[in-house]
Structures are given as structure tokens and as C-alpha cells.
């Protein structure tokens, strides 16, 4: 069993070290992660400059490879330029903060898993709700249990799984729930400030609150203490709208 691990918080993030600890007993583990935090990078690739790969030599990150690029760069380089045999599983995380609803379109954590999925490799993204790494030990334990369950009871077909873990002590977790993506309200407006020269600068505002957090969604599950397991797919075609768009077809 060979597992490729990546993340978007950077190779020094506690969540990456936790995921490495969780999965190392299950087989050979290769870590390739960004040098810097790339939260919100989505599926971006670095095409304007060459990329470099470095290796950490001490601490909890000893042996980790890190790249001066995005999460997708990391998985792409690992699969096409570093690893001779395709790994059995790509796992991303553990992210600091949830990736639910429309978050999956922006998330570098989910994007790293998507890149593995595009190469035909079962892929799982792990995120811990809320910031600050509280109860990371619980998220670490859940990550190992989910991967162990996948290995003992594989899912059918191509696998792209988005897992969100409540920020709770392990004993307080309510269990696991299979969920669909919820929906958010619009994000908050940008925050306008000025630089020392008086010129305007802008900070992207916070994500919107949950709009659809009904039962069955990832938002609902996590809010009620459950680990949310959401299978994803990449076909964004609106099949219902396709029928009406055909009216625009030329002869």
C-alpha cells in the first residue's frame, strides 16, 4: 500500500503531520506539500515559472518533500515526475477549517484530492471544522479510521471523497454520515483599506453562512457532531438546462 499525502496549508502545518502519523502505519507514505499556505488556490497550476522540490531534514516534517507551488502542483509533480509507480491512494489534509458546500470549488485541500482523482487514483480530502487545531488528535484518529474503512470495504467506481470532521473531542463525535453538499449564502463583501501611500487595497471577505443546512447536507451533519462523508464528481453539466440551451443550436 502506497499513499501520497498533500495539503494546502503548507508542509509545516500541524494537520499535515497529523495525517502523516495517522496513515504511516498503513503502508508506505510519501508527502509532497506546498512550501507556503495556499488556502483557496483551488485547482490552479503554476505555468509561468519553473517549480522546485525540496526536502525537510528535521522535526516532524523530516522526509517531507515541499514545492514552491500550489497543492495541485504538488500532486501533479509527484505523480508525473517523482513517483515511478502510481500510488494506491491520494489523501489531502488535514485542513484547518471546513470545506463544505461551495467551499469545494475554492479549496486547495479538495483540489489536491481532485488531481489524484483525475489520474485515476482513489482520493480523499480531510478537513477539520473551525480554526486553531483544537482536538486535532480526534481528527487524526478519524482520518485513519476512514482510510482503514476504505481499504477494508472499498467504495464502488472512481472515488473522490470529501470528509469534514467536527472540532470536538473524539468521545463527543456522534458518528459518520453520508452527505450531499449544502449551500452557502453569498460571501461577505471585500474589506477595503488603504496602503501607506493612501492607495486602496482589498481583502477578500469571509465566506457566507450556510443557506442550505438541511438534514442530509454536510453542514447539518457537522453541526450535529457527525463526521460528514461526501462523494464528489467533476461533471458540472446542468443536464436540466441542457435541454433548453439546445434551442440556441444552429442548424
From Swiss-Prot:
Cofactors that this protein relies on: a divalent metal cation
Where it sits in the cell: the answer is:
Cytoplasm
Cross-referenced SUPFAM superfamilies: SurE-like (SSF64167)
Q: Which domain of life is it from?
A: Bacteria
Please give the GO cellular component terms listed in this UniProt entry.
cytoplasm
Presence of keyword Hydrolase: yes
Question: Cross-referenced HAMAP family, in alphabetical order?
Answer: SurE (MF_00060)
- Protein name in the entry: 5'-nucleotidase SurE
Q: Which organism is it from?
A: Ralstonia pickettii (strain 12J)
Amino acid at each position: 500500500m502506497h499513499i501520497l499525502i498533500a495539503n494546502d496549508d503548507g508542509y509545516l502545518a500541524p494537520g499535515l503531520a497529523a495525517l502523516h502519523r495517522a496513515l504511516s502505519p498503513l503502508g508506505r507514505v510519501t508527502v509532497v506539500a506546498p512550501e507556503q499556505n495556499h488556502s483557496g488556490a483551488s485547482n490552479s497550476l503554476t505555468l509561468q515559472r519553473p517549480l522546485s522540490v525540496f526536502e525537510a531534514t528535521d522535526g516532524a516534517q523530516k522526509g517531507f518533500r515541499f514545492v514552491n507551488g500550489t497543492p495541485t502542483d504538488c500532486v501533479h509533480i509527484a505523480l508525473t515526475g517523482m513517483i515511478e509507480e502510481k500510488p494506491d491512494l491520494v489523501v489531502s489534509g488535514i485542513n484547518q477549517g471546513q470545506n463544505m458546500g461551495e467551499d469545494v470549488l475554492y479549496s486547495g485541500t479538495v483540489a489536491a484530492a481532485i488531481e489524484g482523482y483525475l489520474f485515476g487514483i482513489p482520493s480523499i480530502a480531510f478537513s477539520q471544522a473551525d480554526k486553531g487545531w483544537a482536538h486535532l488528535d480526534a481528527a487524526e484518529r478519524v482520518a485513519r479510521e476512514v482510510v482503514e474503512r476504505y481499504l477494508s470495504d472499498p467504495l464502488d467506481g472512481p472515488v473522490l471523497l470529501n470528509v469534514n470532521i467536527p472540532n470536538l473531542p473524539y468521545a463527543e463525535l456522534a458518528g459518520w454520515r453520508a452527505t450531499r453538499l449544502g449551500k452557502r449564502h453569498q460571501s461577505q463583501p471585500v474589506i477595503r483599506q488603504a496602503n501607506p501611500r493612501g492607495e486602496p487595497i482589498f481583502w477578500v471577505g469571509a465566506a457566507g453562512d450556510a443557506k442550505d443546512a438541511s438534514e442530509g447536507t454536510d453542514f447539518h451533519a457537522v453541526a450535529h457532531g457527525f463526521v460528514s462523508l461526501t462523494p464528489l464528481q467533476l461533471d458540472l453539466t446542468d443536464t436540466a438546462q441542457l435541454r433548453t440551451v439546445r434551442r440556441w443550436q444552429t442548424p
